[in-house]
Amino acid sequence: MFSCRFISATREYSTLEKQVPAPYLRRSFEIKAPVQRAALTICGLGFYEAYLNGQRITKGLLAPYVSNPDDILYYDRYDLTDRLRPGKNVLALLLGNGMLNCPGGQVWNFENVRYRSA
């Protein structure tokens, strides 16, 4: 089993009036000893690119697979065991809109859809 934290922006971060087209998230962290096992698990409703220490680790161009979130959500898991090193490491994510965050919100009452609060 694994443990994880849910990461999201505040509700005020991106609205119809102030859109952020491709948020870039970056986190530096220190590792004091060699890693025995580590993985990154990502599940999102839009597309992303993941980088570790400046190297792209994303499996494909459109990650994750496109799905209908009312039925199924896919996740990607990346084994980072051999990629992490003692000392400073940097994880970065470039987020894209995907199918569920397309323009046209005023028409579809976009501000109030359930998945926007995730």
Task: Kindly label every feature range from the protein language model.
Residues S14-T15, V20, L25-A118:
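Accessory beta-strand-rich segments of carbohydrate-active enzymes
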Residues M1-Y13:
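Boundary/junction segments of secreted and surface-exposed precursor proteins
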